[in-house]
Amino acid sequence: MAEKRNIFLVGPMGAGKSTIGRQLAQQLNMDFIDSDAVIEERTGADISWIFDLEGEDGFRKREERIINELTQMQGIVLSTGGGAVLSKENRNYLSARGIVIYLETTVEKQFQRTQRDKKRPLLQDAENPRQVLEDLAKIRNPLYEEIADITLPTDEQNAKIMVNQIVDLIDNMNGLNGTL
């Protein structure tokens, strides 16, 4: 059996990276890792608190170290934070060490999925969260596209359908009949 390649999920907050990632890992018998959860576990603090204490720059430095470490593992499905692609180093780590899947979503759908979520530091204190999402999309969407091997819109699909599509696309990419 061929060695399993890593699968890295990128995209904005609310695109479904964690939900789809968990199901994809289960279906492929791989380990699922959420980079934000690893950061929280290692620091003993949630992302919002890290943002408050260290600012976004401090958080991004932590994130870069974690992404470098995690992308060197084998046989994982990794869900990255929405801003992980802001770092050129992270983009290099992701694109060089696995298959990058950009889970694309509209700002409208993102807003619907995140408006009640209190764990989104970039939206917490925003007067106009929808505008924040639009501004983030302008900066980040081209970066997601730059490193993506596969781009999939997530607005109208449920997670199970998305997982099956991803498995089919990866199979076709690799020509390995279901083996990553």
From Swiss-Prot:
Monomer. Mg(2+) binds at residue 18. ATP binds at residues 14-19, 120, 157. Its main location: cytoplasm. Binds 1 Mg(2+) ion per subunit. One of its GO terms (cellular component) is cytosol. This is Shikimate kinase. It catalyses: shikimate + ATP = 3-phosphoshikimate + ADP + H(+). It is an enzyme of class 2 (transferase). Its cofactor is Mg(2+). Pfam families: SKI. The gene is aroK. GO terms for biological process: amino acid biosynthetic process; aromatic amino acid family biosynthetic process; chorismate biosynthetic process. InterPro entries: P-loop_NTPase, Shikimate/glucono_kinase, Shikimate_kinase/TSH1, Shikimate_kinase_CS. Signal peptide: none annotated. The keyword 4Fe-4S does not apply. It is found in: Cytoplasm. Its EC number is 2.7.1.71.
